[in-house]
A protein has these predicted regions:
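Conserved redox-active cysteine motifs that mediate thiol-disulfide chemistry
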Residues: 61-75
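Non-catalytic, surface beta->alpha helical segment in thiol-disulfide oxidoreductase systems
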Residues: 116-141
Length: 141
């Protein structure tokens, strides 16, 4: 066991991580920090992050130069808080991760896919408003 000391209080490793998790939850609850759950994944990590996920995953196929993708980004951050614990949200940069883009026949961006149990459940191509994305997620999880 590793002992961690904070303010002269000792914690075993497991207790320390529970303490950190509890502290973060309090900070989120009081809006001191945001969830920021939109995570970037890669060709290498896609199966582990998305296909093997216990939760449904909303994935945005995006690129740095894509204007509509940049418009959706902040909406996805908001939705990550609203759907916290119900879905995970990932982004895949198609320029850097072409294998995944080819595997899922991505021909236009932004493309949003909802994947559950390793299977594509729904797909949306193009920009969307927050209300459209809420409806898309709610109807497909």
């Amino acid at each position: 066991h590793v002992l961690v000391f904070i303010n002269k209080q000792s914690y075993k490793t497991k207790e320390f991580f529970q303490f950190i998790k509890f502290t973060i939850s309090i900070l989120k609850k009081n809006n001191y920090i945001k969830n920021m759950s939109v995570t970037h994944t890669t060709d290498k990590e896609f199966d582990n992050d998305v296909i093997q996920s216990d939760l449904p995953v909303l994935i945005q196929f995006t690129a740095e130069w894509c204007g509509p993708c940049k418009m959706i980004g902040p909406i996805l951050e908001e939705l990550s808080d609203e759907f916290d614990g119900k879905i995970q949200i990932y982004e895949v940069n198609v320029d850097d991760n072409s294998q995944t883009a080819v595997k899922y026949s991505i021909r236009s961006i932004p493309t949003l896919m909802l994947i559950a149990d390793g299977n594509v459940k729904a797909q949306h191509i193009g920009a969307a408003s927050k209300s459209q994305l809420i409806e898309f997620i709610s109807n497909n999880i």
